Amino acid sequence: MNHIQEAFLNTLKVERNFSEHTLKSYQDDLIQFNQFLEQEHLQLKTFEYRDARNYLSYLYSNHLKRTSVSRKISTLRTFYEYWMTLDENIINPFVQLVHPKKEKYLPQFFYEEEMEALFKTVEEDTSKSLRDRVILELLYATGIRVSELVNIKKQDIDFYANGVTVLGKGSKERFVPFGAYCRQSIENYLEHFKPIQSCNHDFLIVNMKGEAITERGVRYVLNDIVKRTAGVSEIHPHKLRHTFATHLLNQGADLRTVQSLLGHVNLSTTGKYTHVSNQQLRKVYLNAHPRAKKENET
C-alpha cells in the first residue's frame, strides 16, 4: 500500500476508533483493489468512474456475496473521500456508483436456555473460569462490542451505579448498566484472579500472563467456552450483542432505549433486532388481540 492508504487506515484507527477486526477488513479491501490496479495497469490517482464500474464487475466475477461487494465499494468510497480532503484535484470515482443492495438477514442470537448453558460452563472453580465468566457476563449483560470490551479500564467500572463507561465508535463515550450477576463476577475476578493483581496497567480484562487481552484473545476464549458446552455450536462476540438486544426487546424494552444502550447513531440500525421468536410472537398476540385473549381465557 502507498502512504496515502496507510495514512487513511491510521486515521480510522486513531480518530474514528475502529476495531482491529474492522481495520483488517479495510486493509484487505485496499490490498485487493491495488492488485486490480496492477493487473489492469491503472493508476490510483487517475482512476475514473468507468474503471470503478469495471472493478464492480470484477468483484462479482469472483462470486462474492452482495454484502461483501457492498463493503468493499464502501471502503473505497470512504478512502477517496479522505483523499479529497488532502488533495483538491482528487475526484471520487465511486461516488456515483450504484451501491449493490445488501442481502437481508436476521441476526443470529442465543436462546435464554443456551445462555444458561454457557454460564454453567464457566462456573468451574478455577482461576481461568473467573476471567472467562467476566468476559461472558460483560458481553451479554451490556451488549458492548468486543473492541469496547478490550479497552475497558478498571476505573471505567462504577460499582455504585452498577455500570461501565465504554468508548464506542467515533470516540463517543456511553454508560451501560449491568446487573447483580455481572457485578459479582467482576468483583470475584478482581479479588481472586492473580494475573490482574500483578499487572502494571489499568486494563480490566487480561490474559493469563497479565497482559491486556486482544480482540483475537476474546474470540479464542469464547470458542473455548463453546467447545465445552453441550448443545451450543457457534459463538462470536457480535452474536452476544445480538442476543443482548433481542432478549431486551423480547421482554418489552423499547427500541430507543436499546439504541442508546448499543450506542447506535441511527434507529434503523437497531431495528434489525426487532425480530422475535415464534413463541414470543404468539405470546404477544394472545395477550394483545381482543378475540385471541377471549379464546385464550376459555
Swiss-Prot record:
Catalytic site positions: 145, 169, 238, 241, 264, 273
A molecular-function term among this protein's GO annotations: tyrosine-based site-specific recombinase activity
Record domain Tyr recombinase: where: 105-286
GO biological process: cell division; chromosome segregation; DNA transposition
UniProt keyword terms in alphabetical order: Cell cycle, Cell division, Chromosome partition, Cytoplasm, DNA integration, DNA recombination, DNA-binding
Main location class: cytoplasm
Family: Belongs to the 'phage' integrase family. XerC subfamily.
Subunit structure comment from the entry: Forms a cyclic heterotetrameric complex composed of two molecules of XerC and two molecules of XerD.
Its job: Site-specific tyrosine recombinase, which acts by catalyzing the cutting and rejoining of the recombining DNA molecules. The XerC-XerD complex is essential to convert dimers of the bacterial chromosome into monomers to permit their segregation at cell division. It also contributes to the segregational stability of plasmids.
Protein name listed in UniProt: Tyrosine recombinase XerC
Organism: Staphylococcus aureus (strain MSSA476)
Gene designation per UniProt: xerC
